[in-house]
Amino acid sequence: MRIMGLDVGSKTVGVAISDPLGFTAQGLEIIKIDEEKAEFGFTRLEELVKQYQVEQFVIGLPKNMNNTNGPRVDASITYGNHIEHLFGLPVHYQDERLTTVEAKRMLIEQADISRGKRKKVIDKLAAQLILQNYLNRNF
């Protein structure tokens, strides 16, 4: 069963996919979106869903450290509602606190990637961490 992980931002959506057995997550790509123009990358998402035969989604919920909803939680849930309606597949939500911080740390410490290059991969890595955390807790 393939699960797709998404890190939804206001300008990009980081995409990750699980292996067929649901053990590991791998970052796929970053889809550019524009909330103001109502461009949410659903066409590209549909291509990936078909290519990888996705059966469900996991979307990161950006909660605050005190467990209250952060300013982007509503946008993430709205995005999830749209893809649930478009694809008819279940959508789960995963607390994503500190995933972007962890992703930045990994890119700096382990990969020694420059700031400019980090911006190009950070959302993809955050999506991978969101999905891997979900897989670790549920499978």
Swiss-Prot record:
Which sequence ranges are marked TM in the entry?
A: none
What CDD domains does the entry give? YqgF
According to its UniProt record, where is this protein located?
Answer: Cytoplasm
Descriptive protein name? Putative pre-16S rRNA nuclease
Question: What Gene3D superfamilies has UniProt attached to this entry?
Answer: YqgF/RNase H-like domain
Role played: Could be a nuclease involved in processing of the 5'-end of pre-16S rRNA.
| A GO biological process held by the record | rRNA 5'-end processing
PANTHER family reported for this sequence: POLYNUCLEOTIDYL TRANSFERASE, RIBONUCLEASE H-LIKE SUPERFAMILY PROTEIN (PTHR33317:SF4)
